[in-house]
Amino acid sequence: MAGHLGLLGFPVRLWARDPRALDGVAEAGGVTVDGVIEGFGRVETCSSLMAALDGADTVLVVVPASAHGDVARRCAPYLRDGQKVILMPGRTAGAIEFTHALRREGCAADVLVGEAQTFLYASRKTGPAAARIHGIKRQVLAAALPARRTHELLTGIKPAFPQFMPARWVWKTSLDNIGAIFHPTVVL
């Protein structure tokens, strides 16, 4: 996703819980993508979450659901009024968990938190600064918390992600989460 956004010309700052995970991207200055999208996308890496969030309009959180609370806790001191945080994907009630964690940490900023029903890309990391995009979904539901702000959330990201469509509320994106159905089946 970072490589694709960089390739499209969007300013991208990348932060990871393990800074070593970004060494290859930092060295290359971005991410090379191949597959249904081909090219090199410029990506800035940040070792500091404060630097990554500073001045960002939209924060895309792409981590396993088990990390939503931890990432929210780490973001809480640095988020500012007007920023949007979108969990990709939210999985089951991710936006609710993220919002509660921000409040627990004392974040008083007017931050709009939302979630996508699933990840937009079928992709895999193929190298330290490379990814293969096998496909991009045509439509993904997304919702904000509170639901009345979903239009505001989507207006800000439509230029980058025209595939996002409004869901009625985060319970729709959470309870229609295909990962909760698909992944346990594979294990069984």
Give each language-model segment a name:
Residues M1-D34:
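NAD(P)+-binding Rossmann beta1-loop-alpha1 motif at the extreme N-terminus of oxidoreductases
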Residues A65-G127:
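Rossmann-like NAD(P)(H) cofactor-binding subdomain of soluble oxidoreductases
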